[in-house]
Amino acid sequence: MDNSSPIYTEFLPISRADMEARGWDQLDFVVVGGDAYVDHPSFGTAIISRLLEAEGYKVGVLAQPRYSDCEDFKRFGRPKYGFFIGGGNVDSMVSHYSVAKIPRAEDEYSPGGIGGARPDRSATVYTRLAKEAYPDLPVILGGLEASLRRFAHYDYWLDTVLPSIAEDSGADLISFGMGEHQTVEIARRLAAGEPVESITDVDGTCYLTDFDHLPEKYVECAGFRKVASDKVAYAKACRIQMDNQDVVSGQIIVQKQSEKYLVQNIPAKPLVRWELDKVYALPYTRRYHPIYESMGGVPAVREVQFSIIQNRGCFGGCNFCAIQLHQGRRVTSRSADSIVAEAERMTHEPDFKGYIHDIGGPTANFRFPSCREQMLRGMCNGGKHCLAPTTCSHMIVDHSDYLKILRRVRELPGVKKVFIRSGIRFDYLMADPDDTFFKELVEYHVSGQLKVAPEHCAPNTLAYMGKPPIQTFNKFKDKFYELSRKAGKKQYLVPYLMSSHPGSTLSDAVYLAEYLYKNHMRPEQVQDFYPTPGTVSTCMFYTGLDPYTLKPVFVEKTAEGKALQRALLQYYEPRNAEKVIKALKMTHREDLIPLLVPAEGRRAVQRSARRAEPAEVTIHNDGTYTVRPNKGRGGRNQSRGTAPARTAGGRQPSPGARFAPNGTAPRKPKNDQQKENTVWKTSKKKK
């Protein structure tokens, strides 16, 4: 191995001064991103900007521009050919809001981890500002946020259906998917003088046109206005979109928006091995730009700085995952030499301590396409999955190539440990008759904890998630702990679990809580289902229908119902006791209360219930009254006071009147819940 591998230190220009330092008067392209500028291949802005640079273009990076006006988009002056824009690694709405729609204060992809550096719907806002700054310049919009909004889509934050982002943003082209092929071809044609309006035949792009200019052959799904008013039409459109995302079998899709028609060309071909190797060998500095140093850097770089991406795509088929509509289901991977060379280069970094945090990708242990048939016929459609509910008989299961790479990296001088943190697909691992990889995974590549994603255990919920049955996870779990014991290691599984996914009833959540209790599992982190654009699960959430069968699906949308399901996943927490008890009573599973609810939690709920019981007020003929609080308010203690004056006509207040224990009228209840908690009993003693 060549120990003279270069360490790259030069960032691309971020200002006019940087341009002038390179002797440039004008840029060819400006790449705009919603994240802080991190020159690392885990960041889309870094890949697109370095790729354009490698093609010979003069490129500047405009990271998290000010969005109050368009002046920041004029920072470099007018670019020669146009803008490439992305919203960031994470959807800006997910970055800004929790699933409960509560604003987040933190943003791992911004300087200092502080939120607010980008606008809501940043991809749309940036595109509009670029068009405002230079109305006649081409603007190509790509990245995750745009890819998942290329069709008319349900927007969870507004609780409505919106048209394609192509219409809303005013972009000339939408580049969906990973984008390298599209970027290079569009840049080449713009540089050759071709008007952007005529660039309508690039695979992996969408554009708006009128009816007279639609392509000759296409499949049409229901238009924006139809899917916004008809949930069956929305579900059918979702299936058409999902069934045409394969590079072999996919067809051009047309969907009418408000006025014009959106045309999605077939997906771009995935990068082949040598192309992936080239992309990941570009001169990334692998760091955040030094302008962020005084602000505490960019937190997101910490986990990826010494991590290696070895593959793209995922045939796992989880219905709640956006990878199918973005990266696609066809898996491609880098060569062993490329991965080892990147690892070797890391060992010369001044901050490297000997630990490579990850060699993985969307799913770490996928290296090749799932079967040979897909190369000829494409991936299976109609909601069929390679791994769920059972492993397809055509599946090629092989960890040997991945294992060879891990062994080579482990042997590099300066490397102490190589971890796998991006997620192991346990059902694929269990389908491998050769357990050599499993043994070495346990012995060498677990940093004390291994993250896995069973997500749930109820058969009904798992089916709607597109996940394998829980029995597969149980076998994996047992073998993991068995191999860990044999290796003399104390290691643990950290399961990812999800509540309130479409199809998950309260009974399903109770079933999951019982499973966790019986298996001595106490998840520290759980999440509610987050309905983001572009997934089958979000379609089910909005329509209440399975898009492949059109059969009804239960969807928990109430805040209380979601809270109960979430509490059951952490049943052992005393703070969740009241919700857990309520859920168990609602599902007639009171038998589980002594098991799932800690004694401390049960006592707290009992105290709370006693405090909520009404006190008894006795009014005496001498104008005084006595209050007998319930046991939670002091047991047998009594308090005396002076009753309010008699009303006109000499009548005592009606039996329904309310009194406070100190003899004064209580404050008016603020809401119905408080009203229920402040009811007082009154009784009048006879003379």
Which sequence ranges carry the predicted segments?
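Intrinsically disordered, Lys/Arg-rich low-complexity segments
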Residues: 608-613, 617-687
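Conserved, mostly hydrophobic/aromatic
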Residues: 172, 279, 314, 339, ...
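Glycine-rich beta-alpha loop elements in corrinoid/cobalamin-binding modules
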Residues: 44, 63-257, 264-265
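N-terminal [4Fe-4S]-dependent radical SAM core
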Residues: 2-26, 36, 232-307
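N-terminal pre-triad scaffold of radical SAM enzymes
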Residues: 35, 295-322, 347, 355
